[in-house]
């Protein structure tokens, strides 16, 4: 695909359909990631012959997501800088942002890989991981940490592509490497008789292939303003400062979500192993809906970012409205569909010979039914957060996350969860819709105020520009 065809100007023309066509490849990409993750869990749950393997994998997810969320947040900062530069047609700045982003992803990925390896055991102990799960969870987590550099490179590369309107190429990459992941899962677990180490190894191999492919694509797009050129790969301090100013708050926001989830996981780990396995299954399946909704965060960031760069406030407002409308529909309808097929989907994860299969199934279905009925609230909250980032405001969503999400969830786990009536899976997860609702309201009010300021600012700049032209 040529660079010309691979870039889209989102500052002209209709919005509703282009937003949807932009989001569909991102949704499919995310769905593939979830399906491949489901394959990991299905293979380890059904074919490893180890009834504790699935619970061990599930007990590490919040911790591994913590580091990935920080890197993805910084990648989001790069996406905003690139989208705004592209909308303003400042291709020289765009190129500097791309080269800075890629080099930073390599450095950051290696740093967090080492950090993850160092804190794996103490972090699992802090999360109250059960003794019978510890050795398996630690092995899985350490192998996954080895893939962090590849994950960082891929996510920054994909952010570059999405920022210029190309959401199809990441789909192509993930569809190819995901298949590799599934085949390696089956090979390592069934043929090589491995367990959690097999699925972790399959995951990081596919991640390194993804990273290599996205770099090759960026190097080969010679006629695109975002093409990678080896001599230009360096850190531009001014660009990096802007990326970090936008990306670190977003990264910390994602990290705070992960920390709050780690706190909740510590509570969940106090429950029976069947509940932990049921939670792992439910969250895995719910991920299909979450991933579809989360795609609108990327859409709102890209569309508002490009139109902010192009100084078009009316298109910014329409972009926000259409992304919120679409994410509500996707979240509500998608939740009902997944709920309807909940039992056959959950049964894929459970070994027919597992003596605890009925208890695991009951826990999974109960949690899915509860969470999916209100998941659209999370989607709207994330979409509003993406719009704020696209407009260059990353600190406000972070502050809201600290209060509405992290503090509330911490209070819940320490003071509400110990109560007998709340000491259950549903009792602990009741805090989720409450925190989403608070976050949504706070972000909605903040975005309204920010938009009015931006519209006033852009209108004033337009007036000055017109006056200058009149003088000429």
Predicted feature descriptions by range:
Residues 33, 37-44, 68-75, 79, ...:
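Alpha-helical transmembrane segments and their lipid-water interface positions
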Residues 21-40, 143, 154, 177, ...:
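Transmembrane helical elements of multi-pass membrane transporters/channels
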Residues 31, 35-54, 124-131, 187-194, ...:
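Helix-terminus/linker motif at the lipid-water interface of multi-pass membrane proteins
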Residues 1-23, 82-147, 191-247, 304-374, ...:
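Short alpha-helical transmembrane segments in multi-pass integral membrane proteins
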Residues 51-62, 141, 200, 273-288, ...:
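Small-residue hotspots at the loop-to-helix junctions and early N-terminal turns
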Residues 75, 144-162, 170-178, 199-214, ...:
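Short runs within selected transmembrane alpha-helices of multi-pass transporters and secretion channels
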Residues 54-114, 151-170, 279-342, 378-400:
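Small-residue-rich hydrophobic transmembrane alpha-helices
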Residues 10-42, 46-47, 62-77, 81, ...:
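N-terminal transmembrane alpha-helices
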């Amino acid at each position: 695909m040529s660079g010309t065809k691979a870039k889209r100007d989102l500052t002209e023309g209709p919005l509703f359909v282009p937003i949807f066509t932009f989001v569909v490849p991102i949704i499919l990409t995310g769905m593939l990631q979830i399906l491949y993750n489901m394959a990991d869990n299905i293979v380890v749950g059904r074919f490893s012959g180890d009834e504790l393997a699935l619970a061990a994998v599930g007990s590490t997810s919040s911790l591994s997501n913590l580091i990935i969320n920080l890197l993805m947040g910084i990648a989001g900062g790069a996406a905003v800088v690139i989208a705004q530069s592209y909308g303003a047609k400042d291709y020289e700045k765009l190129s500097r942002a791309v080269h800075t982003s890629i080099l930073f992803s390599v450095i950051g990925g290696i740093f967090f890989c080492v950090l993850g390896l160092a804190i794996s055991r103490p972090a699992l102990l802090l999360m109250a991981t059960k003794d019978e799960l510890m050795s398996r969870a630690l092995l899985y987590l350490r192998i996954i940490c080895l893939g962090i550099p590849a994950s960082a490179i891929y996510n920054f590369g994909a952010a570059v592509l999405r920022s210029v309107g190309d959401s199809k190429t990441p789909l192509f990459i993930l569809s190819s490497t995901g298949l590799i992941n599934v085949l390696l899962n089956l090979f390592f677990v069934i043929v090589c008789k491995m367990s959690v180490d097999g699925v972790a190894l399959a995951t990081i191999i596919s991640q390194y292939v993804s990273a290599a492919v996205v770099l090759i694509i960026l190097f080969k797009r010679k006629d695109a303003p975002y093409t990678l050129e080896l001599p230009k790969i360096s850190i531009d301090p001014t660009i990096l400062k802007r990326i970090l100013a936008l990306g670190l708050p977003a990264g910390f926001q994602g990290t705070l979500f992960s920390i709050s989830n780690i706190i909740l996981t510590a509570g969940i780990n106090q429950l029976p192993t069947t509940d932990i396995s049921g939670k792992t299954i439910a969250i895995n399946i719910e991920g299909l809906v979450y991933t579809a909704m989360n795609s609108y965060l990327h859409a709102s960031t890209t569309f508002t970012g490009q139109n902010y760069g192009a100084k078009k406030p009316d298109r910014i407002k329409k972009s926000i409205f259409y992304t919120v409308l679409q994410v509500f529909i996707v979240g509500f309808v998608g939740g009902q569909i997944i709920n309807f097929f909940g039992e056959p989907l959950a049964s894929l994860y459970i070994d027919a010979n597992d003596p605890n299969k009925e208890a695991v199934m009951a826990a999974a279905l109960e949690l899915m039914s509860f969470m999916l009925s209100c998941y659209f609230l999370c989607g709207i909250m994330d979409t509003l957060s993406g719009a704020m980032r696209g407009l260059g405001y990353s600190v406000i969503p972070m502050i809201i996350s600290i209060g509405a999400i992290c503090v509330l969830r911490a209070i819940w786990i320490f003071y509400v969860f110990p109560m007998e009536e709340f000491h259950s899976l549903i009792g602990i997860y009741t805090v989720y819709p409450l925190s989403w609702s608070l976050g949504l309201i706070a972000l909605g009010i903040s975005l309204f105020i920010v938009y009015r300021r931006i519209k006033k600012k852009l209108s004033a700049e337009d007036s000055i520009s017109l006056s200058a032209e009149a003088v000429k």
